[in-house]
């Protein structure tokens, strides 16, 4: 189990599939994290109508503190969103969330993962680079709130079961 610094030895970080009941908590995170947050309807659509969509919630002590989503198409995963509550940032929780999303994608048979990130979001870019993502170009004027460019990044995923962890190291909750 993961232990979070400053939360004591018994504090466990949990990951689980997002449900419709999570949307109110996700909306709080969404509004804290993004200048152009998705709507409740967008999340509802993703969870009920998009068979390519996979979303997870990260909980600490039973409380949603982050979430991430991706579309899995053929052998590629496209990260749609990843965000952590403002009060929990700076504690490597975004990294843990990204790790879990990458593990899940590999488990589902995905070989590569892609995302777009604001060119001004250097903190996120450093995290993605640390996890093996490389820049593959720009989408000019991608963000409609300020016409900021998006950096396109790609990473190869390790085959499921060979992500650098020992077999049996992941515990079920």
Residue ranges and their predicted role:
Residues 45, 120, 142-143:
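Positions that flank functional sites
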Residues 57, 78, 83, 92, ...:
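Conserved beta-strand segments that form the floor/walls of ligand-binding pockets within enzyme
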Residues 88-91, 140, 149-151, 155-158:
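Acyl-donor (CoA/ACP) binding surface of acyl/acetyltransferases
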Residues 2, 7-9, 14-87, 98-108, ...:
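Acetyl-CoA-dependent GNAT
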Residues 19, 62, 66, 92-94, ...:
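Conserved phosphate-binding and hydrolysis motifs of nucleotide-dependent enzymes
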Residues 84, 90-104, 122, 126-130:
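Conserved acetyl-CoA-binding loop-helix of GNAT-fold acetyltransferases
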Residues 2-3, 116, 129, 134-151:
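Conserved catalytic-core motifs of GNAT/GCN5-like acyltransferases
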Residues 105-116, 139:
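Conserved GNAT acetyl-CoA-binding A-motif
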């Amino acid at each position: 189990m993961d232990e979070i610094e400053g939360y004591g030895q018994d504090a466990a970080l949990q990951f689980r599939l997002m449900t419709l009941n999570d949307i109110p908590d996700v909306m709080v995170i969404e509004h804290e994290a993004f200048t152009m947050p998705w709507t409740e309807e967008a999340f509802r659509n993703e969870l009920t109508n998009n068979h390519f969509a996979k979303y997870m919630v990260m909980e600490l002590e039973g409380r949603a503190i982050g979430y991430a989503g991706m579309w899995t198409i053929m052998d590629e995963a496209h990260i749609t969103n990843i965000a952590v509550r403002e009060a929990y940032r700076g504690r490597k929780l975004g990294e843990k969330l990204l790790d879990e999303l990458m593990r899940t994608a590999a488990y589902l048979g995905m070989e590569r993962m892609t995302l777009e990130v604001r060119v001004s979001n250097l903190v996120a870019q450093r995290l993605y680079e640390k996890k093996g993502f490389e820049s593959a170009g720009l989408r000019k004027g991608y963000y409609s709130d300020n016409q900021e460019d998006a950096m396109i990044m790609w990473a190869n995923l390790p085959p499921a079961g060979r992500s650098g962890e020992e077999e049996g190291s992941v515990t079920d909750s």
